[in-house]
Structures are given as structure tokens and as C-alpha cells.
Amino acid sequence: MLGIAIPAHNEEEHIAAAVAAAMAAGRHAALGGEACEVVVALDACTDATGVLARAAGARTVEVDARNVGVARALAAQALVQAGARWLAFTDADTRVAPDWLADQLALDADAVCGCVGVDDWSCHGLDAERLHAHFLATYNDRDDHRHIHGANLGVSTALYLKVGGFKHLACSEDVDLVQALERSGARIAWSARPRVVTSARRQARAVGGFADALLQALAAPAGVVAAAAA
């Protein structure tokens, strides 16, 4: 069995699309019919995230922590208890490609760190073009990158348990896990092959996360970003 884990805090705008994409990835023909479950960890949600996630086909678990490390760990625990041999992680504002899970497994590694793409920068209004240019100029979207994104991460259950899983960190829980995997000697594929598209939202949910990095880029002087994109 395979598992896909998604943490969510008040994500009613994005969760249906995120779960639908994850469900499609779990049904990909290259998986040979192996069962796949999608679990959404509802973290202090006060909106319709849970209803929408279940309607799209996910199982939900609940916690009141406002902590992404806790939420990821809870979703992973539910999948481990269900018998998942591989844990794939993404985010509630992210749509994985139909072959995303199959591509993770095809890399034949203990863990997979993937890249992210953005297909809509319009939420940044007049800054959209400048931010997009900065992303294209500075983001390394190729094999052997060293990005760590909770939105595009996979690990064998055996190695996940060996290193103790996600710590209950409010940010950088994904970085902490990958560093633990590196120390354990795990075979990690730093690959651009498994694809996801994430949002460029204006309100960062975690310090040090992808949205936070975008906001820091916006705070840089326009000339600095323009020079980087030249």
C-alpha cells in the first residue's frame, strides 16, 4: 500500500483540487493497481476544509496544534498504521502531477526530494511579473538540486520510522527530516522528475517555507531582483 499525506489549516480554497490531484496520482497505471490512500491532517480548521477533503476522496484526521510538523506527523502515522510502505508528502495548496507518485517510486531511492512549480502569479498583482522573473532566475529546477519542499517529498516507511519521522516543528520540519535521512545514510534522489504545482499565495503559513521565501523576494529592492533576472 502507498500513502499520500497532506497537512491543512483552513484550506477550503485549495483542498478539493489538491486531493483530487493526489487521488489521480494514486490511481496511475504505472502503480500496477497497488492500493493508495490519501490522508489529510486537519489542523485547527474552522472552515469547510474537512468536508471538501472527504468529498474529494481523502480520509481526514484532526489535531488542534497550528503546527505543520505535528500535522504532517499525524497524517504519516495514520498511513503507517494503515500499512503504507511508501509515504508521499504534499501540501494543501499544491496539485501533484498524475505521474507524481509513480515517478517517485521509479527513482528507486529511500527518499525523494522534488522541485515545485507555480502556474499563477496573479495574486501578487503589480509585483507578479517581477516575482516570476526572480523565481525563474534563481530557482534550480533540475536534477541534483538541493531543494527540500514538504510539497514534493517521498520516503520509504522503513526509513521514515528509522529516523523518527517528522519532529513537531512549526517550520522547517521537512528540512529536519531530510537531514536526519542524510545522517542515516539513506539513498536520496534529488530529482526534478516528480512534478507539482503550488500556489504563490501572499500569506505565508510557515516561516522559512516556500511562500515565505517569495515574500522575502518581494521585500528586496526592485533593482536587485531585476539584476538577478537579467
Model region roles, listed by residue range:
Residues 11-28:
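Short, well-formed alpha-helical segments that are part of the catalytic scaffolds
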Residues 99-126:
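Conserved donor NDP-sugar-binding/catalytic core segment of glycosyltransferases
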Residues 50-82:
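Conserved donor nucleotide-binding strand/loop of the catalytic core
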Residues 48, 90-106:
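Acidic donor-binding/catalytic loop of UDP-sugar-dependent glycosyltransferases
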Residues 171-177:
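Acidic donor-binding loop at a coil-to-helix junction in glycosyltransferase catalytic cores
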Residues 30-44, 61-63:
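Short beta-strand/loop segment that forms part of the nucleotide-sugar
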Residues 39-51, 94:
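A conserved acidic beta->alpha catalytic loop
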Residues 114-115, 127-146, 218:
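Short, flexible, basic/aromatic active-site loop/helix in glycosyltransferases
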